[in-house]
């Protein structure tokens, strides 16, 4: 009995059922970067059942009384799906993915001197990074995909001149250089 169950589980990892058409592409939107004023879309294409390429592009925009931002963010990942279970109406995939990213940003913010007078300071910088992500991709209703990932890597920022005294140069600062954690959620659909 155990042999039959383990063999059927291995067979389910490789083949999709007749009720679940095998789509090869996913269009995604980043729900987690939306909280940082970034609209990011991504395209994942499966090269074979165990490997895919994921390319993303996003725009930053924020305009408030004290701060203005505009930027472009791009990223490329090569995903290795190490565990896959495909059922008629859902599928689960665990993966790891090395990534490379670039983030160009123009910022403008107010800074105050000792007398309470403020002035606008502008800054433009480029950030490059790379690292490793680990994630779980869950597909349901034959078309909807939920992708949750975590990981980290390095980030190096060029041309950043921090003149704002309120920035503490943590991983949440756009001009940060160093080791960065990553955590995110993408929502998409198969086609």
What annotation goes with each model-predicted range?
Residues 41, 76, 96, 132-134, ...:
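Membrane-embedded beta-strands of outer-membrane beta-barrel proteins
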Residues 14-23, 49-50, 83-93, 140-146:
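Short loop/turn motifs that connect adjacent beta-strands in outer-membrane beta-barrel proteins
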């Amino acid at each position: 009995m155990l042999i039959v169950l383990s063999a059927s589980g291995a067979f389910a990892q490789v083949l999709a059922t007749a009720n679940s058409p095998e789509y090869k592409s996913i269009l995604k939107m980043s729900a987690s970067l939306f909280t940082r004023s970034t609209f990011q879309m991504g395209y994942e294409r499966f090269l074979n059942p165990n490997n895919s390429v994921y390319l993303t592009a996003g725009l930053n925009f924020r305009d408030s009384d004290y701060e203005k931002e505009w930027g472009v963010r791009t990223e490329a990942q090569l995903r290795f799906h190490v565990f896959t279970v495909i059922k008629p109406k859902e599928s689960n995939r665990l993966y790891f993915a090395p990534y490379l990213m670039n983030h160009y940003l123009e910022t403008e913010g107010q800074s105050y001197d000792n007398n309470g007078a403020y002035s606008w300071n502008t800054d433009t910088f480029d950030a490059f990074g790379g690292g490793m992500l680990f994630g779980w991709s869950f597909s349901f209703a034959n078309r909807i995909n939920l992708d949750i990932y975590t990981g980290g890597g390095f980030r190096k920022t060029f041309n950043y001149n921090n003149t704002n005294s309120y920035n503490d140069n943590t991983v949440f600062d756009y001009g940060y250089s160093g080791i960065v954690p990553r955590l995110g959620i993408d929502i998409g659909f198969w086609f």
